[in-house]
Amino acid sequence: LSSELVVDATGKNTKLPKWLSALGFNVPKEEMIDPKMGYASRLFRPGPGFRADWRATEVSAQAPQNPRAAGLWEVEDGQWLLTLIGINGTYPPTDEEGFKEFARALPNPLVANFLEDAIPLGPIYGHRGSKTRRRNYGSMKRFPDGLVATGDAVCSFNPIYGQGMTMASQGAIELDSVLKKRIATKAPLRGLART
C-alpha cells in the first residue's frame, strides 16, 4: 500500500515512535507531567431527604494533607453525577465500599452526606490516565516525508482540563488549511509535517 500522505491520529497510545525507530529514525523528544491523578464517577438519584439550593458544587483537595476532591453536578432527569478525584497517587476506588470510604475522607462532609441515601443508577467508572504528554516531532532532525501526526498522537492532556478535543480540532483545521494551500499551488507534500 502506498500513499502520498499518512496522518497518524491514533491517539495517545500511538505506535508512531516505535515505527519511526524501526525505520531508523530517532524518536521524538517527549515531555510528560504526571500528577498521579485519578477519577471515579457514578450517576445517582438523590435520596428523598436531599435538599440543595445549588446545581453543582465541588470539594477542593487540601493537599498535601488531604489529596482528595470531588465534584457533584445535577445533569438531567433528576440525576446527579458524582466524581471523586485523587491526586499524588491517592486514587479513588471503583468498588462500592471503597467509593463511599473515599467520600467520607473528603475535607468536607457534603458528598458523604449526599451518598447516605442516594440511589446508584449505574456502575462506578474509573480513570487513571491523567498524564499530560507532548511528543515533539518538530525537534527531529529527520522525519519521513508525507507523514503527519496530530491530536493526542502529538499532545495528550489530563481530561480534567478539557483541552484535548480543542487541540485535536485545531490540528485538523490547520492540516486542512495547509493541504488546501498546497493543492491550490500544486506544491508537493514534502516537508508538510514541519509546516
Predicted features along the sequence, with ranges:
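Predominantly flavin-linked oxidoreductase catalytic cores and closely associated redox partners
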Residues: 1-110
